[in-house]
Design a protein with these regions (language model features):
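A glycine-rich beta-to-alpha transition motif near the start of alpha/beta enzyme domains, typified by
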Residues: 1-111, 150-263
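Short, solvent-exposed secondary-structure boundary/capping segments
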Residues: 113-120, 247
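C-terminal domain-closing interface element
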Residues: 123-125, 130-149, 246-263
Length: 263
C-alpha cells in the first residue's frame, strides 16, 4: 500500500494530512504511532480528510494527536485542511463546512495565504485554583470541543509551562487531560501565548488554545475583540461574538512537503 502524507504548517504547528476522499485509507491509533516510531515522520497532529456522512456537510475529518489519541478540535489543523482542499481542488467553493467530533468548522479561503476557521462556543468559562509545587495556579477552563485551561501571567507569575502542563495531565480535575495555555497580556487586544497540548507537549502554536485564551481575555480580562494572539512563528487574529457565541480565527497555513510511504 502507498500512503501519501501531505505535511502542512499552521504557524509552526506541523499537521500531517491524509486524503481519504480520493483514496480508501483509514488510519487508527496504531497506524499513527507507527508513522512516527517506524517511518520517522514527525507531526503534532494527523488529520484524515473524509467524505461527508451528512449531505449538508462538505467534508468530515478525524484528528489524532502524535501520541495516537483522538482530538476533538485543532484550529491550526482546520486552516491547513482548508488549504489542502484548495491545493488539491477537492471543492470549488472557498467556503466549507467540515464536521469534527467536536463540532462544525466553517472554513474560508481568504487573501494573502490566510484562512479563517469559525465554530460555535458551546461551553462556559469555569475558574479553578489548583496546587502546584507549594504554589497556587489560577486557571480559567473552557471546552472548545477539546479542554483548555488558561493562566494569565499577571495573576500567575513565574510558572514553568512544561512542569505545570505535564502535571495537569495527571490531575483528577482533568480525567481526559487538558491543553494548558500560559498567556501574557500585551495590551487590551493582544496577548503572547505558549501552549502545552495534551498528547503532544508544548507546540509552536495551538489554534484552539489561541481561541480559548482570547475568549477568556475578552470575558474576564477586559480585552477587546478581535484579539491578536502571538506565537513564536506568527499570530492568529481571534474574534468572538458574544451575541451568537461564534469564534473565528484568521491566520496563515503553508504546505511543507509530501511524504510517500510504501508498505
Amino acid at each position: 500500500m502507498t500512503l501519501n502524507l501531505y505535511i502542512y504548517s499552521g504557524l509552526g504547528n506541523i499537521i500531517a494530512i491524509v486524503d481519504s476522499v480520493r483514496e480508501d485509507i483509514s488510519l487508527d491509533t496504531e497506524d499513527v504511532l507507527n508513522l512516527q516510531e517506524n517511518e520517522g515522520v514527525n507531526f503534532d497532529q494527523l488529520i484524515q480528510v473524509l467524505p461527508p456522512q451528512d449531505p449538508e456537510i462538505d467534508f468530515d475529518v478525524k484528528i489524532h494527536n502524535n501520541d495516537g489519541s483522538v482530538a476533538s478540535n485543532c484550529i491550526n489543523g482546520a486552516r491547513c485542511v482548508a488549504k489542502f482542499i484548495e491545493d488539491h481542488s477537492l471543492s470549488a467553493s472557498k467556503q466549507l463546512k467540515v464536521n469534527t467530533i467536536g463540532g462544525i468548522w466553517r472554513l474560508e479561503s481568504m487573501s494573502e495565504g490566510n484562512y479563517s476557521a469559525t465554530f460555535l462556543l458551546s461551553d462556559v468559562i469555569k475558574p479553578i485554583c489548583i496546587s502546584h509545587e507549594e504554589m497556587y495556579v489560577n486557571l480559567d477552563c473552557i471546552s472548545l470541543g477539546n479542554p483548555h485551561g488558561v493562566a494569565f501571567e499577571e495573576t500567575n507569575p513565574k510558572l514553568d509551562i512544561l512542569k505545570v502542563g505535564k502535571d495537569l495531565q495527571n490531575n483528577s480535575l482533568f480525567p481526559d487531560g487538558v491543553n494548558f495555555g500560559l498567556a501574557n497580556k500585551v495590551s487590551s487586544n493582544e496577548i503572547n501565548l505558549r501552549v502545552y497540548e495534551r498528547g503532544a507537549g508544548e507546540t509552536l502554536a495551538c489554534g484552539s488554545g489561541a481561541c480559548a485564551a482570547a475568549v477568556i481575555g475578552i470575558a474576564n480580562k477586559e480585552m477587546i475583540a478581535p484579539v491578536k494572539v502571538n506565537f513564536q512563528l506568527g499570530s492568529l487574529l481571534v474574534d468572538y461574538k458574544k451575541e451568537n457565541n461564534m469564534i473565528s480565527a484568521i491566520g496563515s497555513a503553508a504546505f511543507v512537503e509530501e511524504i510517500v510511504i510504501e508498505s
